Structure formats: structure tokens, C-alpha cells
Amino acid sequence: MPYKRNAELPATVRKLPAGAQTIYRKTWNSVASDGGSEAKSASIAWSAVKKSYRKDGDRWVRRAG
């Protein structure tokens, strides 16, 4: 099931900054629409988030560059 809005994302993802949530949602939807399982969609979506954001203590912050 595709996510239409960030508010529909799992609770763990909703704790991310809005930009990271959008990256996760768009990536998850793309992988899922290509026939990927939920687990594969989530794994690839987290990888996409981690390319642009990093965890600093308890917070996620945008990577420089």
C-alpha cells in the first residue's frame, strides 16, 4: 500500500525531520510499485534517508554537502 502522506508513515519514521520522511515515503513507494516486498521497500528507504541524514545523538540531522 503506497503512503500518500508523511502522516501515514510508521511511527519510527514520523520521528524523522520532514525532509527525511519525504525521502523515505517516496523511496518506499517507488520500490513497492516495482514489486518490492514491504521489508525490501523499508530497507531501501532507510538507506536513502541515511544518504542525506545522519543521527547525531537522539536527533537526525541533514548531512553537509
Q: Model-predicted segments: where are they?
A:
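C-terminal alpha-helical interaction appendages
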Residues: 1-65
